[in-house]
Amino acid sequence: MHKGKKNYPNLITSFRMNLKKIILNHDRFSHPERWKTNALLRFTFVYIKFLFDLMIIKNPLRMVGKTYRDAVTALNSLQSNYANIMAIRQTGDRKNTMTLLEMHEWSRRIGYSASDFNKLNIVHITGTKGKGSTAAFTSSILGQYKEQLPRIGLYTSPHLKSVRERIRINGEPISEEKFAKYFFEVWDRLDSTTSSLDKFPHMIPGSKPGYFKFLTLLSFHTFIQEDCKSCVYEVGVGGELDSTNIIEKPIVCGVTLLGIDHTFMLGDTIEEIAWNKGGIFKSGAPAFTVEKQPPQGLTILKERAEERKTTLTEVPPFKQLENVKLGIAGEFQKSNASLAVMLASEILHTSNILEEKIKCSSNASIPEKFIIGLQNTKWEGRCQVLEKGKNVWYIDGAHTKDSMVAASTWFRDMVRLSKRKKILLFNQQSRDANALVNNLYSSVSPEITFDDVIFTTNVTWKSGSYSADLVSMNTSQEDVEKLKVQESLVKNWNKIDDNRAKTHVTASIEEANELIETLYDEPADIFVTGSLHLVGGLLVVFDRIDVK
């Protein structure tokens, strides 16, 4: 850049992020009626609009190309940064009641009403543990009926290696070309339309919905343009105020196992969390849930179902699945697979493909196509086993207490009889990492003792850069650079393990992989867990090595 020349795109991005931070932290903006009565605020926004119209702070990204990389760059600009997330947490305001109203408005601006999404014949899935796996199972079952349902959409989060994984058709991520095409169709429609600031004070000219909301809009647009006959939607967080809850008439809803997670948004108790999850229930759409839910949570789910004038049915593990090798490993997946069977059954019966619904009984007879769908389900990063050279990698992106216990138990059972060296590769940057490590340790001990334990950041490359699809602004960059979390984890591990394992800290996933390759000449079993960011980054590192 020439000396003295201003970097307008960076200035603009900085201005917009700071403006957003002001809005998020200002009480008046959470209450539109207060905004209407404040002349100073109204004048400020009129002036801001004037600046936008002069192209001084107009979105700079509309002037760049429209490749897949451009789309990813534009999408990453919509992430909330760490400071904003912390500010929202500190306010203690868990209910942004404008969220769904804004989703309806964003939809209008790209040419849709919520009723347009009804044609997608949606399965809507929430829960704390296993909702992504259940969504994948359901999609795979429906995919066995290609003659009647030639295109099945699947919307899940987060992604592992590529953001395209979030929007799938017939189980495969949409192509880079289609992602870019549909992305910029949505982006440009938002640029060419405006909203009433009286009704939507957050939606200033040139602004966009946040990262997840934008992807939700993009998924609807993609699935409609691709003429999908049925779609499976996984909730992002919670349910009641999740952006996917713009879905007005799902065919069926599912709730996987409940647990404590995302407490700053959903509440600190299982009752509060269940209330949020039950927010996806709709009149006329039957709801199903797994057995052995926490009793307090199940009570709330039943109350929510009654309130929404629908039914809630507990699904037992089907005996017919006991000897079936599911496409996603782990004994606990039998419950998710059973739930998926009931969800798919509702869709297929409603579509006049199945004459009779499958009975919700442990002794029910499950059609062969359902079994094939469950066996063929592919879902990377969940109880995944990879052989790389002399080593065997056991990979699971567990990041909650319950999922960590399940994943650690799976690893313990898989390697209990193995005589190989045992290595743990762990990362968790934003949750209570030490508590997760304690859950892991208690689940594998005393049967499994690790020889080496490596704590890494979620940075992909040793150059300090991330794979473009894995850029995350949701963690403290200072903590990442100073390895604060990793050093804390080392102290905690040495304490609970009585200094038996050798502990290591790496600044990137690539360095962690290189370290593992040099630790031993003999084979090793490596357990990779703690976050999906770690799992995704490691798979990207593997891909680069395979290409070489």
UniProtKB/Swiss-Prot annotation:
EC number(s) reported in the record: 6.3.2.17
Top-level lineage group: Eukaryota
Catalytic reaction annotation: (6S)-5,6,7,8-tetrahydrofolyl-(gamma-L-Glu)(n) + L-glutamate + ATP = (6S)-5,6,7,8-tetrahydrofolyl-(gamma-L-Glu)(n+1) + ADP + phosphate + H(+)
GO terms classed as biological process: one-carbon metabolic process; tetrahydrofolylpolyglutamate biosynthetic process
Residues bound to Mg(2+) 1: S157, E234
Residues annotated for Mg(2+) 2 binding in this entry: H262
Record keywords, A-Z: ATP-binding, Cytoplasm, Ligase, Magnesium, Membrane, Metal-binding, Mitochondrion, Mitochondrion inner membrane, Nucleotide-binding, One-carbon metabolism
Gene deletion effect: Methionine auxotroph. Undetectable levels of folylpolyglutamate synthase activity. Increased rate of loss of mitochondrial DNA. Respiration-deficient. MET7 and FOL3 double mutant cells are not viable even in the presence of methionine and folinic acid. MET7, FOL3 and TUP1 triple disruption mutant is able to germinate on YPGA medium containing thymidylate and to grow although poorly on synthetic medium containing methionine, adenine and thymidylate. Adenine and thymidine auxotroph when grown in the presence of sulfanilamide.
Residues annotated to bind ATP: G130, K131, G132, S133, R382, D396
Pathway this chain belongs to: Cofactor biosynthesis; tetrahydrofolylpolyglutamate biosynthesis
UniProt main location, coarse: mitochondrion
An example molecular function term from Gene Ontology annotations: ATP binding
Similarity comment: Belongs to the folylpolyglutamate synthase family.
Database matches in PANTHER family: FOLYLPOLYGLUTAMATE SYNTHASE, MITOCHONDRIAL, FOLYLPOLYGLUTAMATE SYNTHASE-RELATED
Protein name: Folylpolyglutamate synthase
Organism: Saccharomyces cerevisiae (strain ATCC 204508 / S288c) (Baker's yeast)
